[in-house]
Amino acid sequence: MKFDVIIIGGGLAGLACGIRLAEQGKYCAIVSSGQNALHFSSGSLDLLAKLPDGQAVSQPLSALSALAELAPEHPYSKMRNITQLDELVQEAEALLRRCGLDIVGSSAENHLRLTPLGSCRPTWLSLADIPVAPLNGPLPWQRVAVIGIEGFLDFQPQMVASALQDQGIDATADYLHLPALDRLRDNPSEFRAVNIARILDLPENRQPLADELSRLSSTAEMILLPACIGLDKSAPLDALRAVVGKPIQLLPTLPPSLLGMRLHQALRHRFQQLGGLVMPGDAVLRAELVDNRITGLYSRNHGDIPLRAAQMVLASGSFFSNGLVATFDKIYEPILDLDILSLPHRADWSHSNLFAPQPYLQFGVNTDNHLRPLRGGVALENLHAIGAVLGGYDPLQQGCGAGVSLTSAVFVAEQIISEMAVTL
């Protein structure tokens, strides 16, 4: 099976890279082993919230020079040696909008998103259904009704309301009861956001839901709900807003995250619409190399039939997605045994303080400035690495996980397009 480009991994980075390549007419295949981290996403995407020294960042693009001094191995720092990162960021934003996603935010300045705990976190882009506020301004609401769903344990309205009250907002907490959910509620293991959304999205349940929300929010100017409506798109929520006559925003729940799934579905639909091929439930097990080039990939489902392409992209994720594997005494990349940025002594991999930055989160594949992975200190000619498999950054402490995924995806796609044009 022959393609122009094969991408290993179907998460945010892999899909974004595939979309950009397919938009330029490249025939791409994505080998995806299963659920990716987007299913755990809040629906907001971070670009850069903190520098490695802990300094807060309000304008991400203005902080890149300081980041390069503090973290020269950071993917942003490497990409800045080759191109303008602001151009990659702008293209990433445009790519998401071409996928039909309604997003708010800008790289010029971070904004605040409301978390399921009622606190605020800085971020870059958010789905339009998520409650957001200016970075340095007051929260834009005075009276808020936080409404959970009776029997739904993955969202606690009292916790959100209490945190909002601490910020000077008149917030109330209540639970709605909808008879349409009673049968689902009888099985707690099935009473999850996705299954609830399938019921709440039905047109026949809209008016009863609107009546219940109106009853519980009579004095509120805005309603906060758990993200349990609008499974595929926001149209059911828009229709509910029209009936209730008030703004209704969604807060993420425990996984699986409906907002993250909506992101994934939009990206995957765009990729397939452009002619890309997704191989779900498959995994690349090994690679065939001649000199310093990959000539074939062998996957679990295709056995001895090699997958061939002129260019390969490694977007296999970090430990969560098995793109990196940890044994008792080492970290390794399982397909090609690529060079890894890590620490030699296991005792140094983590800190006893759970809330301190954890060193292992910065472990990942080592690359050159073109994001070509190193193997024995030498860059492979036709392989690039993108997203969470890369080393040199802490996506949690620095608040840059989605930004690295999207910018590295666009960066590598543009390099591949240029290289293939020269080859032709």
Swiss-Prot record:
| GO molecular-function term, one example from the UniProt record | glycerol-3-phosphate dehydrogenase (quinone) activity
Question: What keyword terms does UniProt attach to this protein?
Answer: Flavoprotein, FMN, Oxidoreductase
Q: Which reaction does it catalyse?
A: a quinone + sn-glycerol 3-phosphate = dihydroxyacetone phosphate + a quinol
Could you tell me the EC number(s) of this protein? 1.1.5.3
Tell me, what is an example of a GO biological process annotation in this record? Answer: glycerol catabolic process
- What does UniProt give as GO cellular component? glycerol-3-phosphate dehydrogenase (FAD) complex
Q: Which SUPFAM superfamilies match?
A: FAD/NAD(P)-binding domain (SSF51905)
Pfam families linked to this entry: FAD_binding_2
Q: Which InterPro entries does the protein's record reference?
A: FAD-dep_OxRdtase_2_FAD-bd, FAD/NAD-bd_sf, G3P_DH_GlpB_su
What pathway is this protein said to act in by its record?
A: Polyol metabolism; glycerol degradation via glycerol kinase pathway; glycerone phosphate from sn-glycerol 3-phosphate (anaerobic route): step 1/1
Q: Which cofactor does it need?
A: FMN
Origin superkingdom: Bacteria
Q: What does this protein do?
A: Conversion of glycerol 3-phosphate to dihydroxyacetone. Uses fumarate or nitrate as electron acceptor.
Question: Which HAMAP family does UniProt cross-reference here?
Answer: Glycerol3P_GlpB
Name the family. Answer: Belongs to the anaerobic G-3-P dehydrogenase subunit B family.
Q: Subunit structure, per the record?
A: Composed of a catalytic GlpA/B dimer and of membrane bound GlpC.
Protein name as annotated? Anaerobic glycerol-3-phosphate dehydrogenase subunit B
| Source organism of this protein record | Yersinia pestis
